[in-house]
């Protein structure tokens, strides 16, 4: 079923690197073409994914986020093995990695399809626009100086509010258990296409989180004399200036995970994971 498989690992986690070697050896023994590389090598990964039919990650949610950005716009399914902490997106424990891979190779499992956002960063000056895919969240926030910034929000080209706050988060359903949740946002069912808008420590005005329909377009406009930053999925980070706009909408692209657990896995594990219990269900 799978003729070419890529293994993407967390390069700073020795256990993730060692497991990647064992998985590659298993695929070699089965005569399946495979390649391995670091999740931190986006350019190299992009050059290797041609004709790859399955991606296996060894790491945590951060490894998955980097992998997703590297393989897009290709919608290659991901089988994820948790060597991180909470692991909301991961599927297997390290102990079950080989057996789980064998099950997937035998045709078992189902596809868990996740919605993405796409963002266009529009500088206020003549600098070129930039485009991003977003799996978890986009954050416009203050810089290192502890001063609030103003972020004006338009929804579908209509003014909504101006946050005077530490910043604002626009999140997918997948990202709803991350920074948005920590800032007081709701948790969405992971396959939802809705979009979450959440202010970060607002000083005055609207302090609530808002769930927007999937067809919404959201503009965040920076208005500050102080340092401000844009963070995409927690690892693409850049300074932004007053007058810059981040325009976000739902993407037509998806990220697909291979699951071996029943389709109610999210609800069964949600409370445990949000309480900070990092133990995998496969370790119990």
From Swiss-Prot:
UniProt entry tagged with the keyword NAD: yes
Catalytic center residues: 61 (proton acceptor)
SUPFAM superfamilies assigned: NAD kinase/diacylglycerol kinase-like
Subcellular location: Cytoplasm
UniProt-recorded Gene Ontology molecular function terms: ATP binding; metal ion binding; NAD binding; NAD+ kinase activity
GO cellular component term, pick one: cytoplasm
Domain of life: Bacteria
A matching Pfam family: NAD_kinase_C
Ligase is among the record's keywords: no
Record-listed NAD(+) binding positions: 61-62, 66, 136-137, 147, 164, 166, 201
InterPro entries tied to this protein: ATP-NAD_kinase_N, ATP-NAD_kinase_PpnK-typ_C, NAD/diacylglycerol_kinase_sf, NADK
Annotated family: Belongs to the NAD kinase family.
Name recorded for this polypeptide: NAD kinase
Organism whose genome encodes this protein: Dehalococcoides mccartyi (strain ATCC BAA-2266 / KCTC 15142 / 195)
Phylogenetic classification of the source organism: Bacteria, Bacillati, Chloroflexota, Dehalococcoidia, Dehalococcoidales
